[in-house]
Amino acid sequence: MTIELTHTTGLDPRSLALRTAMDTETFGLYSEWFASMPEQERARLDAALHTDQEDLTEVVIASEDGVDLGHAALRALADGGYEVKKVFVFPHARGRGLSRILMKEVEDVARAKGETRIVLQTGEKQLEAIALYRAIGYEPIGSYGPYAGLDDLVFFGKNL
């Protein structure tokens, strides 16, 4: 397996295609949960989870033989530091360690920018993601930044 890592931004059409695939999968996991929420709460959650493509200034795409397999990104937080966003590997490419490769790469990018800590948010139904984050040294933290008070989500941080 020869995996190529491409550094780009959220404006890259390849990044958009991968994020769209991730959003489709994630919506399937959480559609009943979203539907059961009061409208005001759902609107607040939608606003917190929304990511403008322009805000993804550091994106890493994993590909093999010209075929995109996965994606991870960094978004600068308003109060400083970086958040890992949109970690996704297509189902047919899972089980090959690509998420670990992508996470290491975005951590290295953050470290090169002088960061000493990185955070991320995921959902409680994304058990494989939670297991990965714990396995690579992320620890549970409280809500932060745009997610303040959204305690139904799962938050992790890691010292770099």
Where are these regions (language model features)?
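C-terminal "cap" of GNAT-fold acetyltransferases
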Residues: I3, H7-L11, E25, K113-V119, ...
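Conserved glycine-rich acetyl-CoA-binding loop
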Residues: G66-V67, G81, F90-K104, D108-K113, ...
